[in-house]
Amino acid sequence: DRRQRQMCIRDRRYISGNVLSGKQVSPNGFLGAFHSQLTVIPEGDDVHEMFGWIMPRFNQFSANHSYFSWLMGKKEYTLDARIKGGERHMIMSGEYDKVFPMDIMPEYLIKAIIAGDIDRMEALGIYEVAPEDFALCEFVCSSKMELQRIVRVGLDMLRAEMA
């Protein structure tokens, strides 16, 4: 029984805050100063898929219809902490626009931040955003980019420029 509990603890990811913008903590960790919830999700490291990239995946969630699960109608999915692939080149596909909560162009803003173009960042509305605004974009990002970190770097770059 104790061994099963230890395995259960190891197979879970503990997040201080919400799933999209929280920080990973240890099972004995604490909530962050600005967090009001503890989220626990499956780690997913116990799942091994042979040729997972080529399978049709009828039971996997996909925001951009990469898998055939969207043909099966609405259903609940069990999501885990796996990234399922590495970082890729940024593709301008409009996927951020579908989920971004504000009326700005998030893909162009991210490109301006990566390029370090402060004038373009200001023109595209960097003063109106926070890293947490890009949490859902990061979730649906087919390029697997850490968009919240990129936005934080851009805001820090602006702060350094103003000082």
Task: Label the model's feature ranges.
Residues 22-163:
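Gly/Ser/Thr/Ala-enriched C-terminal appendages of enzymes
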Residues 1-9:
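Single conserved hydrophobic/aromatic residue that forms the stacking wall/gate
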Residues 10-18:
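Short loop-to-beta-strand transition segments
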